[in-house]
Amino acid sequence: MIASYLPSILVPLVGLVFPAIAMASLFLYIEQEEIS
């Protein structure tokens, strides 16, 4: 039963959370480069 519910949780997680983390890390990297 858990396996059938897993994609409905995993797809939004990868589609929304991962890009948000990537954007945030990229933003912080650019900010550090400008400051230093």
Swiss-Prot record:
Q: Write out the entry's keywords from A to Z.
A: Chloroplast, Membrane, Photosynthesis, Photosystem I, Plastid, Thylakoid, Transmembrane, Transmembrane helix
Q: Does the keyword Chloroplast apply?
A: yes
Which chain regions cross the lipid bilayer?
Answer: 10-30
A single Pfam family, by name? PSI_8
Q: Name one GO biological process term.
A: photosynthesis
Q: How does it sit in the membrane?
A: Single-pass membrane protein
The record's similarity note reads: Belongs to the PsaI family.
- The name on file for this protein is Photosystem I reaction center subunit VIII
Q: From what organism does this protein derive?
A: Mesostigma viride (Green alga)
